[in-house]
């Protein structure tokens, strides 16, 4: 009898080992059970997980026009019903989800994306949750869906540049609870504070664990600058920062993270807010977005150890479209009380290296030639570690009011636009600064720089002037842009900053109104 022996190459063995290594510490219960990356999940895998783990409920979750996740619950009646909902999705009323959809023809389909499956950490009954995509009556992706807009933006970026657009967010939020009076933190000095001066480290780490179990790729978490007491309440700012992933996943994990942080806050009786401003004179919460451009798995942001022409072109696009990007990233009047000098937020259109007074920052990128690990740990061998993948650029204007899909789509359009400009490198050179622009001695430099909008209405003006760029290649639909313009102009806030200057009571009314934004 003859036997045919299948030859297994060394490359296949190494690939298999690498995949297993990436899965062995994965906190997502579905990934761990199925033994495969989430992006490879099939309907059969989801059914297998449900039947093998006594899952009683399935939740469909999807972002609506207010930027928050909505939920549709399903009892698993039988195997046929489970197969039907996973295959066909379900109908929803689009007019109740999006302001641009008319009630007369509002039915939409929501269909689950299997790669997003996660075990709901808050449900009393064992529940599997999945994020969904929207489809219209003809079974086509909903053109004005925020996530589909981001998908189109990424495809357009790829078509123009031949490269991939990746992103990650820095999610800032405040936790508010009664002040015990013990170990008070220093006002506005909460950055990386430890317990017992930081009161909500355990809350943050529990949030991080749940986000990771839901598929979020987290870099780290820490307490932030904002830390103060007011009316016997302690206000503590925290941040959870993610790792760069493809832009669609970056937006998905931010949505899930906000949902988890709010639910855990509700469980413990804490107030949690992502609002851009919560009181006068204190640091507001931003939603900084880091970006990198990748080709064939290689980060293209560096060339010979310095920022590459590719990165500079992307920055140039953001410099040109920065005023209109506020329409996606700064969506209510309190956003523009954050974008003021000396409040950890940008005010002018410029960029620089390791500079927190600029709009787009190029963070420290491990370009040092020394082996810092060996210097700190003399017993370690002298080995090379490729740190080039770490380099990103950071847009610092957005805040927690943003629709994360629209925001990252807008940034993808802006970066693509940089490759369509003949003078992109000249723009990047002209807008570069290497000083703190808010210091008195740099006043002349500050005057030479364009300013960001100072109100929702001014942001709408900027978007209207540049809307054609966002609508190119069918990325942003005209209906979506019209809806954003209408929303921004509805606030009538063109002179609001001046009108309530020195009126803390009026400021607090605004804060209360937009406390739960995003």
What are these model-derived regions, one by one?
Residues 35-36, 44-51, 56-66, 70-138, ...:
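Active-site capping/gating regions of soluble enzymes
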Residues 338-341, 430-438, 481-492:
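Amphipathic alpha-helical surface "interface" segments used
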Residues 8-228, 245-259, 270, 406-407, ...:
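ATP/Mg2+-dependent ligation/transfer catalytic cores
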Residues 174-186, 219-243, 277-297:
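Active-site-proximal loop/short-helix segments
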Residues 16-19, 179-180, 230-235, 380, ...:
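Short hydrophobic/aromatic-rich motifs at helix boundaries and adjacent loops
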Residues 391, 398-400, 411-470:
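A hydrophobic, small-residue-rich beta->alpha segment in the mid-to-C-terminal subdomain
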Residues 25-29, 185-187, 290-299, 384-391, ...:
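Short acidic (Asp/Glu) and glycine-rich catalytic loops that position anionic groups and cofactors
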